Amino acid sequence: MINAPVFRRVLALLGDLRLAILLLLVIAIASMAGTVIEQGQSLSFYQANYPENPALFGFLSWRVLLALGLDHVYRTPWYLTLLVLFGASLTACTLTRQVPALTTAQRWHYYQEPRQFTKLALSTTIPQGSLTALATALRAKGYRVWQTDTQLYARKGLVGRLGPIVVHASMLLILLGGILGALTGFMAQELIPSGETVHLQHIVEAGPLARIPQDWSVKVNRFWIDYTDAGEIDQFYSDLSIQDAKGQEVKRGTIHVNRPLRYGGVSLYQADWGIAAIRFRLNRSPVLQLPMAPLDTGGKGRLWGTWLPTRPDLSAGVSLIARDLQGTVLLYGPKGEFLTSLRTGMSTEVNGVTLTLVELVGSTGLQIKADPGIPLFYAGFALLMAGVIMSYVSHSQVWGLQENQRLYLGGRTNRAQLAFEQELVAIARELAPPSQTTAVDL
């Protein structure tokens, strides 16, 4: 059984604003580290970019980086623990501060004596003022009014007291979305040649509770690139089919950058491309195919190449180089000398053999992601915007008391003091007899 005093102390500690600010600061720093440091890269990448001597900032080497989990910040136990603690702090703050404030705001009572009005920041006395006229004026300005024969209470903007609770609830939704995504989400990368079908195999990141779908596969019906007049890439496209375990198509769509295909909570993004193979004929042979591999250019562009034997004993051949899918291939001899260029459908003679270029086969690079927390993210941000707007609504209260042919009027608000004062002054002047000058004492 939970000890009540201990529970209250823990609740008070978690609800401390200073703790919430500290947790938020640490989360922000950790998130910045996850943004600056490349996530999910290979060991060799971190060894090359974060050497031990000299270490970055004197301490951040690849060993420290991996030990702290900075290569996958958002899935580390300590980062998720920070999110849970911050969520607990928000919950405690809501229960100990915001909910009691809302409950107090909903409680009200009539003022029964004139001296009670002196405690209000805004109050005045209207000779021969009418309580009924006051109620009518307040209703016209959107107040909800309760009254007896001699007493009145009115309020509006109670939703403003609900705003902070909605903001806290939205932040909890966002945190829950982040935790759910880290635990159950995954990301895969696949490089698939046109016409091929694959299951998800190359998993880059996955949460401990992630379920990788194996009951469907992805088929690339076609991959193509649109080029500008200058020969630069304008956009690349993939015509994809989702197939069930029996090979039946269950969904089809064409994707390009920033326009994914979604199926079963999984999004398939166009992320990269390559040249998978070259198809050709030698003399009158059937169409043959050789795979092409990316070449190391030292950062000077992208090239793909392969070696084509022109003799059965592999004693002679040519190197084929391509830089894009526009259909041009460069041929080089055994000593690296340039021989000729060849376009799709054209032929040339090499080492006594007629080589005909049929086509270059492109491959599409897909980034495949599942994040079950995204709906909670969207709901949380929508709720956050609503809560912020609600928080800007002023909660205004007005009391009235009619006694000895005098109307005592007073009120208070939690924000927009000047606007409330002007509103109360206007009401007081409306109720005052023509011969009287009424002012609100501050």
From Swiss-Prot:
Query: How the protein assembles, per its UniProt entry?
Result: May interact with CcsA.
Describe the family membership recorded for this protein in Swiss-Prot or TrEMBL.
Belongs to the Ccs1/CcsB family.
Taxonomic source organism: Thermosynechococcus vestitus (strain NIES-2133 / IAM M-273 / BP-1)
Q: Which Gene Ontology BP annotations are present?
A: cytochrome complex assembly
Disulfide bridge positions per record = none
Bilayer-crossing residues are 17-37, 76-96, 162-182
Task of the protein: Required during biogenesis of c-type cytochromes (cytochrome c6 and cytochrome f) at the step of heme attachment.
The record gives the membrane topology as:
Multi-pass membrane protein
The record's GO CC annotations read: plasma membrane-derived thylakoid membrane
Record keyword Cell membrane present: no
Transmembrane: present as a keyword of the record?
yes
Where, subcellularly, is it found? Answer: Cellular thylakoid membrane
**Entries under InterPro entries matching the protein:** Cyt_c_bgen_Ccs1/CcsB/ResB (IPR023494), ResB-like_domain (IPR007816)
User: What is the protein name stated in its UniProt record?
Assistant: Cytochrome c biogenesis protein CcsB
Pfam families associated with the record: ResB (PF05140)
Q: Which UniProt keywords apply?
A: Cytochrome c-type biogenesis, Membrane, Thylakoid, Transmembrane, Transmembrane helix
